[in-house]
Amino acid sequence: MPLPDFHVSEPFTLGIELEMQVVNPPGYDLSQDSSMLIDAVKNKITAGEVKHDITESMLELATDVCRDINQAAGQFSAMQKVVLQAAADHHLEICGGGTHPFQKWQRQEVCDNERYQRTLENFGYLIQQATVFGQHVHVGCASGDDAIYLLHGLSRFVPHFIALSAASPYMQGTDTRFASSRPNIFSAFPDNGPMPWVSNWQQFEALFRCLSYTTMIDSIKDLHWDIRPSPHFGTVEVRVMDTPLTLSHAVNMAGLIQATAHWLLTERPFKHQEKDYLLYKFNRFQACRYGLEGVITDPHTGDRRPLTEDTLRLLEKIAPSAHKIGASSAIEALHRQVVSGLNEAQLMRDFVADGGSLIGLVKKHCEIWADD
C-alpha cells in the first residue's frame, strides 16, 4: 500500500490512546473477553472510541481529536464510566499498568482481525508476547517536514517519557528489576527502537518505499518505532509510555508531550543530526531499567546527567508553552512527582514488599482505576 500524503492537521491538537487490561476476578488473570465488552459499549460511547488491540485481553480507549488535555480528560472520563459498567455487568474488571504481572503469553488469543492475523503470521509467538499495555499520544502537525522535525525533537526526550510513566516492574510472575519492562518485549521486532534517520518528508517517503519492499509493511501501522509519523492523521505519535494506573496520570503525560511539541515547533531549539541518535538505545535502556534514577549521556559532549535533574530542566523549559496550550496543571503534577521521587513502578514494588500478592496487586490496580 503506498504511503498517503501527509494530512494537514491543526498544530498541537491531541489524540490519546490507552491500552487497558481486561481481568477476570477473583483470580485477576487476564480475561479473553474484550470483544464482548466492545459489543456491549459500542452504542453507548458518544465521544472517542473503544476498540480491539492485538489480543482479546486488551481494550483500547481512544479519544477523538482534542484541542487540549481538558477535553481529552472529559472524553476519557465518559468512556471510563461506560466501560466500567459494562465490565461489572459481565463480571470483569479493568486496570492500567504496562504489563500484567503474572499472565502467561501462551494463553493469549489474537483478535479475529485481518491485520492482527496477518501480523501473527509474520511474527508468530512474538505477537502473543506483545500482550503489554501502552499509552500513545498523537500531536497534530501542519506539514510532513514539521512532523519530521518534531519526531527528532521528541526523540531526545524518550528516556524522560519512559521514566515518568514507568509502570511495568513485574512480568510472568517475576520482578524484572526494570522500572519499565514493557519496551523490552519489542526488542526482537526488526523495527524496534528509533525510526531510521531522515531529514525531511521526502526522504521519509523514500524510506517507507524501501521498507515496503520487505512485504512485511503494508501501512505505517505495521511499523513499531518508538515515535512514528502518522500521515493519515497528520500527526506524530509517541508510543513509549506504559499505560498509567490512573486517567489523571495519562492526561498529564499527554500534556507533557503536547507542551514539549509546542516548545519544539515554536522555538526550534535544535539543529537535528544523525549523531543525536548515537547513544539513543543506551539512554533508553537507562530509563527502562532505573526510571528517573537513570543517567543519560549526551552523544556530542559525553556529559552524563541524572534523569531526575534533566527532567526537571525539561519541565522548566516547556512551562511557558504549557501555559499557552492549557497544560500547566499537567506540568505542575509531573514536577511534584519528580521531586517526590515516586513512580508507579516503585509503588507496585512497595505493595509487594509489604506482603501483598501479585493477585492482590492487580486487584488494587482495578480499584485505583475505578476510583480515579
UniProtKB/Swiss-Prot annotation:
It is an enzyme of class 6 (ligase). It catalyses: L-cysteine + L-glutamate + ATP = gamma-L-glutamyl-L-cysteine + ADP + phosphate + H(+). The keyword Electron transport does not apply. It holds the Pfam family GCS2. Its EC number is 6.3.2.2. Keywords: ATP-binding, Ligase, Nucleotide-binding. Homodimer. This is Putative glutamate--cysteine ligase 2. It comes from Shigella sonnei (strain Ss046).
